[in-house]
């Protein structure tokens, strides 16, 4: 079952509701059925997502972009945010929560100079790369659905637009905390931390301790990177907007 994302309850300092602008002539090419069952989605849920993306029928979903900041290549950038993707909801399985994220669904308030599109070859790379990492038992986001389109977009050359539905335990990045910390907005920083405690059963053992939460995030991130090194994997863009709070390999490009 897909539920409205609880992150929306935090308010407009955290999120911006956005109507997706889907690429032209979207065609569903692939459903990761094993992943769907693991995160608590049935055939009706998958049909609802497909109808939403291809026919824009499902009005129950409330897509939104998240605000965050980040250090990029050593320099702090005070506002980044979801520039070409939207969170559309959450699913639940075995007391765990999973995010559902559209990648390549058009311009958002955080797009800056981008066109909000993902391209076919990078979307294929993300799908295959994430499944390979999962098969090697390295924590990672994964792709639930893969869509092709007929739309052409300008990069170094013209490319074909595509879209994926990405899943992960959370899309809360290090940069979400930085966004409020560097604004000296302690009230909303605390709201974000409380949201983590209230939403994720993985943090129950922290007993509301921010120090324990921080240590758990550090440990899971260090374990992930050690797994990368053991494999010989290089992420290539290790900015703080590309790390989430569960130490999952994230944002393949």
Report the location of each language-model feature.
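Phosphate/ATP-binding catalytic cores across multiple sugar-kinase/actin-like superfamilies
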Residues: 217-228
């Amino acid at each position: 079952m897909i539920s409205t994302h609880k992150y929306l309850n935090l308010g407009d300092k955290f999120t911006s509701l956005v109507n997706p602008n889907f690429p032209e002539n979207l065609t569903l090419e692939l459903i990761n059925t094993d992943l769907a069952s693991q995160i608590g989605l049935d055939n009706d849920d998958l049909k609802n997502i497909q109808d939403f993306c291809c026919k824009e029928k499902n009005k129950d979903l409330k897509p939104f972009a998240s605000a965050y900041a980040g250090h990029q290549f050593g320099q702090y950038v005070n506002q980044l945010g979801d520039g070409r993707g939207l969170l559309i909801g959450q699913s639940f399985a075995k007391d765990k929560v999973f995010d559902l994220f559209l990648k390549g669904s058009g311009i958002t308030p955080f797009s800056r100079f981008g066109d909000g599109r993902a391209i076919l070859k990078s979307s294929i790379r993300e799908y295959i790369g994430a499944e390979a990492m999962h098969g090697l038992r390295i924590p990672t986001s994964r792709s639930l659905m893969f869509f092709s389109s007929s739309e052409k977009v300008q990069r170094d050359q013209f490319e074909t637009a595509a879209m994926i539905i990405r899943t992960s335990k959370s899309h809360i990045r290090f940069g979400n905390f930085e966004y409020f910390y560097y604004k000296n907005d302690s009230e909303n920083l605390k709201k974000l931390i409380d949201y983590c405690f209230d939403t994720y059963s993985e943090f129950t053992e922290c007993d509301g301790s921010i120090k324990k939460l921080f240590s758990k995030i550090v440990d899971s991130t260090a374990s992930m990177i050690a797994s990368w090194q053991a494999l010989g994997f290089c992420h290539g863009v290790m900015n703080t907007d590309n790390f989430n709070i569960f130490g999952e390999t994230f944002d393949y490009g």
